[in-house]
């Protein structure tokens, strides 16, 4: 159906009256406009002739009242209702022009088509065809009218057409819905549109706007000036039409109503294209179209037109002509403001050209220069990536080599094969320990054997490795030595034989062992001598290096040669004891790695196997004797360590080497064949679980009363008597225990000496097998102070051991619950148990 449906004549006055029907024509002028002649499939209406001004003035039926220059003008009636607008010929044409610009003219055409269909004769055969045409044109497809109609209304019309039940009111519901939509949206926008404002400003009397397309030729000329190029001169040709008195004024309502049109026309006339798909002029880059936030634009309008106490005059009871009962509250005003903000939405602002220059990065350059710069940057990036990749590959290769060497060292040490690399004595990460770890190992060793003295070989460093490690360590020492049992002069510093063999781990351990285990005040001369010796070790004169590790000895040869001095200790350190140990004329046994008087060269430690047998025999004897005499060793051996502590270093070393490791004289060095043979398999490592059980058993026996005491000589002779008949690959304990026999009495003596000022507190916590031990500077301790020492807070029961004759064991555990009670002491210390309350 054609969209050229225009205003039709109103129904005959004799027809049924409808509230939404337009006003009847002026009496006497009914015949000036011919009636509508609908055609088949098309609702046509002849365009009415212009009504004269006299008829327009008298169309209210009352004539011109006396005393008035003119009645209400059509422009005033257009603002009253949509019917008044559509009832006027010029108003309907102007409204249609507005809807065409908004691309929703189908709503107006559908409204006029419904009016024309209502006037048709139902008996005419054309009526059914017109109804079908209206349904197909506006309702069946997905048009603007179809989107605004309710589904029930569309269903009702479709059913009526299918059943051919045609009625004059079948489109009334659809017309009412479309009319409501136009009244709420299009009609309100039309009253503030530029077309309507232009027509109002001209007074509706200028007929130039009706020629050559009528009102559609109106054009809004307000806005920014077009962009002017630097080499051009601006002329006023573009503003000729703006000089006419018909230009819309720059009022707030006018600007707000014409904002969208002005922005569109400015974009079309400017250099920048309105469509994003088209290229952008460089002059306007970065100055795209912006939309002012709805809140800022509307708040600005609201604040400028706000009816506040400052902006309203208070001359009489009415405020600016507004009755006080219609003012409303602040909440109502705010509600209206927010409703206006939601209705208006975003206000599009016109394009504002900027004259700033483009940034340097966006300045167009020559393709060749751009390509050269891009290539240089890409090559630089490629070099960086390649260098980083190669560095990562090298690091990965180093890690793989280290892992491979570590696995080879572990396999070679397990199979007993000789290791050619000098650093085989120092596996990766073997000595990287912090002081806290060494201190923890020291305390755990003290707690494991509090009542047993270990067979010692003199001064030693605290144990920090497992037994199997020390065993393999000794085996490697034997395997790396020459067959003749002699060392070249270059072996004076075994672990620092070459500068290339000085690793970070070795240096770290040397520093740690030297500081923490030999921290005795030294003179300036001793420090210089040690530095000179260290330089000689780092710069050897020969090319063949042999590794030799004296794991327990700190003595020096009687006549050292220049640059020929042993670097003792487990980790290859330079102990201070070497500088002031024994006297030059003192001869050391072969077991201690001393110098032979006849050969004048360092000898092999030939009694490593004998030492292992001593350790194994000591474990068997101590296990057998601890059942009956667990405390005899602890209380009897006090004189020897005190005496040895007061003796000068030379006498201490002499006594130790003359008596041997077990405390009695040694006549000859006993050698075992498997010790000297590097092809023999290593001994089986001890069971860790068995060692822990043995330590727990000894700790449990500490609390038993002392029953028997004997002399030092007989006790040591019973425990340390060697079993020479046993020779074979048997399991033995950690070799570091062999040196505890010499140091345990010394430690116990110092503990008893400090009891006058310090208090030893030992307790078992919640059934744990290993107890906790603390030293407190106090003469006595209460339960409250004891609770403060616990790191874990909670509800516990506290039991403390005290001497008692009630039982045969001679002691009981007494429960104490009062915080002010002084805790009992047992054998000079506090021994308690903390149990959790279930």
Curated annotation (Swiss-Prot):
Q: Which InterPro entries match?
A: Axin-like, Axin_b-cat-bd, Axin_TNKS-bd, DIX, DIX_dom_sf, RGS, RGS_sf, RGS_subdom1/3
**Post-translational modification comment from the UniProt entry:** ADP-ribosylated by tankyrase TNKS and TNKS2. Poly-ADP-ribosylated protein is recognized by RNF146, followed by ubiquitination and subsequent activation of the Wnt signaling pathway.
Q: Where in the cell is it found?
A: Cytoplasm
Q: Where is the composition biased (Low complexity)?
A: 303-318
* Record's compositionally biased regions (Polar residues): 42-55, 727-737
Expression by tissue, per the entry, reads: Expressed in lung and thymus.
Provide the RGS domain boundaries.
81-200
**Major location, coarse class?**
cytoplasm
Which residues lie within the region annotated Interaction with beta-catenin?
413-476
Under which name does UniProt file this protein? Answer: Axin-2
Q: Look up and give the organism this protein is from.
A: Rattus norvegicus (Rat)
């Amino acid at each position: 159906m054609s969209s050229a449906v225009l205003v039709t004549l109103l129904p005959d006055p004799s027809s049924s009256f409808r509230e939404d029907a337009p006003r009847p024509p002026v009496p006497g002028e009914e015949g000036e406009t011919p009636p509508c002649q609908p055609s088949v499939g098309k609702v046509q209406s002849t365009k009415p002739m212009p009504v004269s001004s006299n008829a327009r003035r008298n169309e209210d039926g009352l004539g011109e009242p006396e005393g008035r220059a003119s009645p209400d003008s059509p422009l005033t009636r257009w603002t009253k209702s949509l019917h008044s607008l559509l009832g006027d010929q010029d108003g309907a044409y102007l409204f249609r022009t507005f809807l065409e610009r908004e691309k929703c003219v189908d709503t107006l055409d559908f409204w006029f088509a419904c009016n024309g269909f209502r006037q048709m004769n139902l008996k005419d055969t054309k009526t059914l065809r017109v109804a079908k045409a209206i349904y197909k044109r506006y309702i069946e497809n997905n048009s603007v009218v179809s989107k605004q109609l309710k589904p029930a209304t569309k269903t009702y019309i479709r059913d009526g057409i299918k059943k051919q039940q045609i009625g004059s009111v079948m489109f009334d519901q659809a017309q009412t819905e479309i009319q409501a939509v136009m009244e709420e949206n299009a009609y309100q926008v039309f009253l503030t549109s530029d077309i309507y404002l232009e027509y109002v400003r001209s007074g509706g009397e200028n007929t130039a706007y009706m020629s050559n397309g009528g009102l559609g030729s109106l054009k809004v000329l307000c806005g920014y000036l077009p962009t002017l190029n630097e080499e051009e001169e601006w002329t006023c040709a573009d503003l000729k039409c703006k000089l006419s008195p018909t230009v819309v004024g720059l009022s707030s309502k006018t600007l707000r109503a014409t904002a969208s049109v002005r922005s569109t026309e400015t974009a079309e006339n400017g250099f920048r294209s309105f469509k994003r798909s088209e290229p952008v002029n460089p002059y306007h880059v970065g100055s795209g179209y912006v939309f002012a936030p709805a809140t800022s634009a509307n708040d600005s309008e609201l604040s400028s037109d706000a009816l506040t106490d400052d902006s309203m005059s208070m001359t009489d009871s009415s405020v600016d002509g507004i009755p006080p009962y219609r003012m409303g509250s602040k909440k109502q005003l705010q509600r209206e403001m927010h409703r206006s903000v939601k209705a208006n939405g975003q206000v599009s602002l016109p394009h504002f050209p900027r004259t700033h220059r483009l940034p340097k990065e966006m300045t167009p350059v020559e393709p060749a220069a751009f390509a050269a710069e891009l290539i240089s940057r890409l090559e630089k990036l490629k070099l960086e990536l390649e260098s980083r990749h190669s560095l990562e590959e090298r690091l990965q290769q180093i890690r793989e080599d280290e892992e491979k060497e570590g696995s080879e060292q572990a396999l070679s040490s397990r199979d007993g094969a000789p290791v050619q690399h000098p650093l085989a004595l120092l596996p990766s990460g073997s000595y990287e320990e912090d002081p806290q770890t060494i201190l923890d190992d020291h305390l755990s060793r003290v707690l494991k054997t509090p009542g047993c003295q270990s067979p010692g070989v003199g001064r030693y460093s605290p144990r920090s490795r497992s037994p199997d490690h020390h065993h393999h360590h000794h085996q490697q020492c034997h395997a790396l030595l020459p067959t003749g049992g002699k060392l070249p002069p270059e072996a004076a510093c075994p672990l620092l034989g070459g500068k290339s063999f000085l690793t970070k781990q070795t240096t770290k351990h040397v520093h740690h062992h030297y500081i923490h285990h030999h921290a005795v005040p030294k003179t300036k001369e001793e420090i210089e001598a040690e530095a000179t010796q260290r330089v000689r070790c780092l710069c050897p004169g020969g090319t063949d290096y042999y590794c030799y590790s004296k794991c327990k000895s700190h003595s020096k040869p009687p006549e050292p040669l220049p640059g020929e001095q042993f670097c003792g200790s487990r980790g290859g350190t330079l102990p201070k004891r070497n500088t002031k140990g024994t006297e030059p004329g003192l001869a050391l046994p072969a077991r201690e790695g001393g110098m032979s008087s006849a050969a004048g060269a360092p000898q092999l430690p030939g009694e490593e196997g004998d030492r292992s047998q001593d350790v194994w025999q000591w474990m068997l004897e101590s296990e057998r004797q601890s059942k009956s005499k667990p405390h005899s060793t602890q209380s009897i051996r006090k004189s020897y360590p005190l005496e040895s502590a007061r003796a000068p270093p030379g006498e201490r070393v002499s006594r130790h080497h003359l008596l041997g490791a077990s405390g009695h004289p040694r006549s000859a060095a006993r050698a075992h064949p498997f010790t000297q043979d590097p092809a023999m398999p290593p001994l089986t490592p001890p069971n860790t679980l068995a060692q822990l059980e043995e330590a727990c058993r000894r700790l449990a026996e500490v609390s038993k009363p002392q029953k028997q005491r004997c002399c030092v000589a007989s006790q040591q002779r019973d425990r340390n008597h060697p079993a020479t008949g046993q020779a074979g690959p048997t399991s033995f304990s950690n070799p570091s225990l062999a040196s505890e026999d010499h140091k345990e009495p010394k430690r116990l003596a110092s503990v008893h000496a400090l009891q006058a000022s310090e208090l030893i507190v030992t307790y078992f916590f919640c059934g744990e097998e290993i107890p906790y031990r603390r030293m407190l500077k106090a003469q006595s301790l209460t339960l409250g102070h004891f609770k403060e020492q616990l790191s874990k807070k909670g509800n516990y029961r506290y039991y403390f051991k005290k001497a008692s004759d009630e039982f045969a064991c001679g002691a009981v555990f007494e429960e104490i619950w009062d915080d002010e009670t002084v805790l009992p002491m047992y054998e000079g210390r506090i021994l308690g148990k903390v149990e959790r309350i279930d």
